[in-house]
């Protein structure tokens, strides 16, 4: 059953009515026509609602617990996936998953944050908030891909890097900086996709790419709206105002030249139809790979650096 967000209350009410009618249907009472009419209304209401989402509402959609996560993308995108673990310096961080994969027969290295989809998996993956060893693992895998000439694909979905004392003691800031530096220095294509939340340095550490793609209802920002509101107005309740001011939506960021391509989602968001959303992403990735793979190493590096130097120019 879909979890409804606050602004989806009218949709939830219609769906409840449909469920009641289905339960009441019997041989003596045919309610198929009424149910069909209500289903049409639901689709229209969803379409109208999602066509006019505010930035804060998009933030809620990006955080939806039923939105596809890294393992869902791997299962649907890749014919083959061989996970690689550990940073060879401290240990394994399961907030970041990565490994060798084949997408439509093409060999790639794929890396991304995994938030988890239930209590146990969320704790296991630390809600997608990586520690230094997670970013150092990403560095190791990116360098491995560079050595073997494999394109790198990263899927970003994190509220940010883990801010705990243990992470700081092990060099969180340095690990994020080194990971960003590694992204910029690769001589192979690097394609990054913001699939849900793209939060702060924890996101950009694996997203300094040749091409940055973003799902229609994803968000990408230097801080969460709640954090921004707490700093600017000392009131996290003003998160909606902060989200609007931060320009964190795919449309805003595409207009600013930060995002290169918006991947459209099914009506009602990727969580309502994961297969359609992932199929759209696969098509976009294959097109981007076809564009980038013929480029030589120097051209790829120059393209990546120019992209970031031009931001704000």
UniProtKB/Swiss-Prot annotation:
InterPro entries: Acetyl_CoA_COase_a_su, ClpP/crotonase-like_dom_sf, COA_CT_C. GO terms for cellular component: acetyl-CoA carboxylase complex. Residues 30-291 form the CoA carboxyltransferase C-terminal domain. It is an enzyme of class 2 (transferase). Its EC number is 2.1.3.15. Pathway: Lipid metabolism; malonyl-CoA biosynthesis; malonyl-CoA from acetyl-CoA: step 1/1. It is found in: Cytoplasm. One of its GO terms (biological process) is malonyl-CoA biosynthetic process. GO terms for molecular function: acetyl-CoA carboxylase activity; ATP binding; carboxyl- or carbamoyltransferase activity. PANTHER family: ACETYL-COENZYME A CARBOXYLASE CARBOXYL TRANSFERASE SUBUNIT ALPHA, ACETYL-COENZYME A CARBOXYLASE CARBOXYL TRANSFERASE SUBUNIT ALPHA, CHLOROPLASTIC. Acetyl-CoA carboxylase is a heterohexamer composed of biotin carboxyl carrier protein (AccB), biotin carboxylase (AccC) and two subunits each of ACCase subunit alpha (AccA) and ACCase subunit beta (AccD). Component of the acetyl coenzyme A carboxylase (ACC) complex. First, biotin carboxylase catalyzes the carboxylation of biotin on its carrier protein (BCCP) and then the CO(2) group is transferred by the carboxyltransferase to acetyl-CoA to form malonyl-CoA. This is Acetyl-coenzyme A carboxylase carboxyl transferase subunit alpha. It comes from Zymomonas mobilis subsp. mobilis (strain ATCC 31821 / ZM4 / CP4).
């Amino acid at each position: 059953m879909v979890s409804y967000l606050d602004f989806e209350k009218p949709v939830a009410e219609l769906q409840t009515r449909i469920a009641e009618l289905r339960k009441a249907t019997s041989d003596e009472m045919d309610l198929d026509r009424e149910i069909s009419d209500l289903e049409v209304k639901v689709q229209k209401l969803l379409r109208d609602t999602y066509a006019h989402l505010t930035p804060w509402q998009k933030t809620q959609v990006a955080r939806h617990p039923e939105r596809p996560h890294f393992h869902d993308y791997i299962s649907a995108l890749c014919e083959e996936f061989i996970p690689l673990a550990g940073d060879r310096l401290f240990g394994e961080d399961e907030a970041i998953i990565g490994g060798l994969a084949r997408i439509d027969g093409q060999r790639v290295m794929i890396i991304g944050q995994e938030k988890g989809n239930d209590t146990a998996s969320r704790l296991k993956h630390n809600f997608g908030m990586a520690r230094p060893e997670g970013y150092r693992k990403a560095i190791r895998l990116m360098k491995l891909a560079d050595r073997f000439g494999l394109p790198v694909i990263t899927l970003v979905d994190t509220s940010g890097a883990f801010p705990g004392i243990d992470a700081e003691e092990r060099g969180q800031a340095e690990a994020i900086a080194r990971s960003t530096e590694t992204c910029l220095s690769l001589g192979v294509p690097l394609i990054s996709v913001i699939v849900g939340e793209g939060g702060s340095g924890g996101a950009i550490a694996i997203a300094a790419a040749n091409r940055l793609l973003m799902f229609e209802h994803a968000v990408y920002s230097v801080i969460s709206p709640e954090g921004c509101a707490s700093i600017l107005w000392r009131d996290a309740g003003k998160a909606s105002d902060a989200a609007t001011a931060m320009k964190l939506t795919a449309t805003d960021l595409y207009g600013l030249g930060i995002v290169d391509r918006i991947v459209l989602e099914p009506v009602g968001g990727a969580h309502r139809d994961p297969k359609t959303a992932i199929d759209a992403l696969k098509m976009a990735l294959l097109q981007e790979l076809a564009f980038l793979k013929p480029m030589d190493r120097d051209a790829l590096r120059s393209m990546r650096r120019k992209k970031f130097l031009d931001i704000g120019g």
